[in-house]
């Protein structure tokens, strides 16, 4: 069976068994010869000819590096030189800028004609002047902020209020400083003065804090009073039972001052400090719940004999 794909009349291959004896071989040409340069130019045609410039010896085309330098120089020449203004021109420009920072086109034309300057130069000057003013304002504001911040750091901060529940008001030292500097006398006392109420948590203050507070306040009375008599008089618990309440550090404020009133032989006991206002009828729980309350003179004074009560009635 004959193959359909095979040609019916096969032709011999032209490159097989070909005789090259009649062919002429072109000898290599010298690149310096003008014929080689002309041939290379003819081979580069159309748009490719611009990119096929061969820098061969004897070629008339300039080198590529020189052309690039020339193009860069031409671009640099396009930038205008810096305009220098005379003193009169500068004053005229500044005067108009002080009036308006955005002059319209008519003002720019008039000013350009008056100063013999191009209108574009006047326009550029105003634009640069606005930028300069904005930059100066930013620098001034930055300096002001830098001056304010160090001054705030140097200001002493006010002491914060102590969050401790043991802090109370008014302070005892402030109370005693408000007393008159003259010698103590019943006629000079303000019997209507009151104490600010304090919560029961004040009695739970630690011993060391009470001792520091008491040490900062001078003793009001010089005569010492027996603490055991106070305990018996006010039905207080034993000293061992109240060690946590720290009443033992307030002995100096539980001292009496004795005065003879109206020629009568009875002496009255006046108590100051935290024990003010306590009567024998009050028990320990009542005292803790009603600490630092204000009482009248008859409630705060206690005589040796309860039957002999003296009402002085001072205002």
Curated annotation (Swiss-Prot):
What's the chief localization of this chain?
Answer: nucleus
Domain of life, per UniProt, equals Eukaryota
GO annotations of cellular component type: chromatin; nucleus
**Chain intervals with Low complexity compositional bias:** 136-147
Extent of Polar residues compositional bias: 154-163
Please indicate if the UniProt record lists Amino-acid biosynthesis as a keyword.
Answer: no
Which residues lie within the region annotated Disordered? 135-163
Q: Which residues bind DNA?
A: 78-137
Q: In which tissues is it expressed?
A: Expressed at low level in testis and undifferentiated embryonic stem cells.
* CDD domains according to UniProt: homeodomain (cd00086)
Q: Does the keyword Transferase apply?
A: no
Tell me the GO molecular function terms.
DNA-binding transcription factor activity, RNA polymerase II-specific; RNA polymerase II cis-regulatory region sequence-specific DNA binding; sequence-specific double-stranded DNA binding
Q: Where in the cell is it found?
A: Nucleus
Pfam families per the UniProt record, alphabetical: Homeodomain (PF00046)
UniProt keywords, alphabetically: Activator, DNA-binding, Homeobox, Nucleus, Transcription, Transcription regulation
Q: What family, per the record?
A: Belongs to the paired homeobox family.
Say what the protein does. Transcription factor that acts as activator.
Q: Do you know which PANTHER family this protein is assigned to?
A: ARGININE-FIFTY HOMEOBOX, HOMEOBOX PROTEIN
Protein known as: Arginine-fifty homeobox
């Amino acid at each position: 069976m004959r193959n359909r794909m095979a040609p019916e009349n096969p032709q011999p291959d032209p490159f097989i068994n070909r005789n090259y004896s009649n062919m002429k071989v072109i000898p290599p040409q010298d690149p310096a010869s003008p014929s080689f340069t002309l041939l290379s130019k003819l081979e580069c045609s159309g748009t490719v000819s611009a990119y096929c410039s061969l820098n061969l010896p004897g070629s008339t085309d300039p080198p590529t590096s020189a052309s690039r330098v020339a193009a860069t120089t031409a671009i640099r020449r396009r930038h205008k030189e810096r305009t220098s203004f005379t003193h009169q021109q500068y004053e005229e420009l500044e005067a108009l800028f002080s009036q308006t920072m955005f002059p319209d086109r008519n003002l720019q034309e008039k000013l350009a004609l008056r100063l013999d300057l191009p209108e574009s130069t006047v326009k550029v000057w105003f634009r640069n002047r606005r930028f300069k003013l904005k930059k100066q304002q930013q620098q001034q504001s930055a300096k002001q902020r830098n001056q304010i911040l160090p001054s705030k750091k140097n200001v002493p901060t006010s002491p914060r209020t102590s969050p401790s529940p043991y802090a109370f008001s008014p302070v005892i030292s402030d109370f005693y400083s408000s007393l008159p500097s003259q010698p103590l006398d019943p006629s000079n006392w303000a019997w209507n003065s009151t104490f600010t109420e304090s919560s029961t948590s004040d009695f739970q203050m630690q011993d060391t804090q009470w001792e520091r507070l008491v040490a900062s306040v001078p003793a009001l009375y010089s005569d010492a009073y027996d603490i055991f008599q106070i305990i018996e008089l006010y039905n207080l618990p034993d000293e061992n039972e109240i060690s946590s309440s720290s009443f033992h550090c307030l002995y100096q404020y539980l001292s009496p001052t004795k005065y003879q009133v109206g020629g009568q032989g009875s002496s009255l006991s006046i108590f100051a400090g935290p024990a003010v206002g306590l009567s024998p009828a009050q028990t320990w729980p009542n005292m803790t719940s009603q600490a630092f309350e204000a009482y009248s003179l008859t409630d705060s004074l206690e005589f040796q004999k309860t039957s002999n009560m003296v009402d002085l009635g001072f205002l």
